[in-house]
């Protein structure tokens, strides 16, 4: 028998509608959360809603890597101890957080904001690939090469840390074609991750090893 909802309050139903619009939250879970909020002290609920308002209205995106940040430049890009000649390309902010949790990567990032997915109407222009190409071009500018020579002459590297499914591989190949002309090293994660696995669901040990043992990207 189908689950039928009968709400004693229109306001409660509207709250359930809003909460259930979140990914992974069904209507029963949304109802449970809404009823829980009703039991909380008013100041707790105000703190909860204020945090969401501030997140939506005040969070910024780093002008270099597109990571979410409280400032125009995120804490990773502003860290001079990081290797700014190594850029790890990821699909989402969550991927950055997962890689950082491994403690195995010390470069910077570039968040694409998705992957190429024709079936979902997402093309290269819908992602931050153009900004990535500009960053890579900057790595081989005379000024950047002179600075790198003073720091040991390390070759610039782009790590394609995208999922191994068809869409992820398509995106990696497209990016490779866009940046190959600049002569930077292009690598991808070692395939400790299964085909189609997302970084979000990889355990820290497996993900860390995939980064350390990364391989030259073979188009």
Residue ranges and their predicted role:
Residues 45, 121-122, 168:
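Alpha-helix N-cap/helix-start motif
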Residues 4, 121-124, 199:
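Pocket-edge positions in alpha/beta enzyme catalytic cores
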């Amino acid at each position: 028998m189908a689950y039928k909802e009968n709400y004693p309050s229109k306001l409660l139903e509207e709250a359930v509608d809003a909460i259930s619009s979140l990914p992974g939250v069904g209507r029963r879970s949304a109802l449970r959360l809404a009823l829980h909020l009703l039991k909380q002290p008013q100041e707790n609920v105000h703190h909860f809603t204020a945090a969401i308002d501030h997140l939506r209205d005040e969070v910024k995106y780093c002008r270099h890597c597109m990571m979410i940040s409280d400032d125009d430049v995120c804490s990773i890009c502003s860290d001079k101890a990081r290797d700014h000649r190594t850029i790890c390309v990821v699909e989402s902010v969550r991927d950055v957080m997962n890689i950082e949790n491994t403690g195995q990567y010390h470069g910077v990032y570039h968040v694409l904001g998705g992957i190429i997915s024709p079936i979902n109407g997402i093309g290269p222009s819908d992602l931050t690939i153009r900004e990535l190409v500009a960053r890579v071009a900057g790595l081989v500018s005379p000024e950047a090469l002179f600075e790198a020579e003073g720091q040991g002459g390390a070759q610039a590297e782009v790590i394609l840390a995208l999922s191994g499914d068809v869409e992820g591989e398509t995106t990696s190949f497209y990016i490779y074609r866009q940046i190959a002309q600049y002569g930077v090293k292009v690598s991808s994660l070692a395939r400790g991750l299964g085909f189609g696995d997302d970084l979000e669901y990889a355990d820290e040990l497996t993900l860390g090893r995939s980064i350390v043992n990364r391989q030259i990207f073979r188009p």
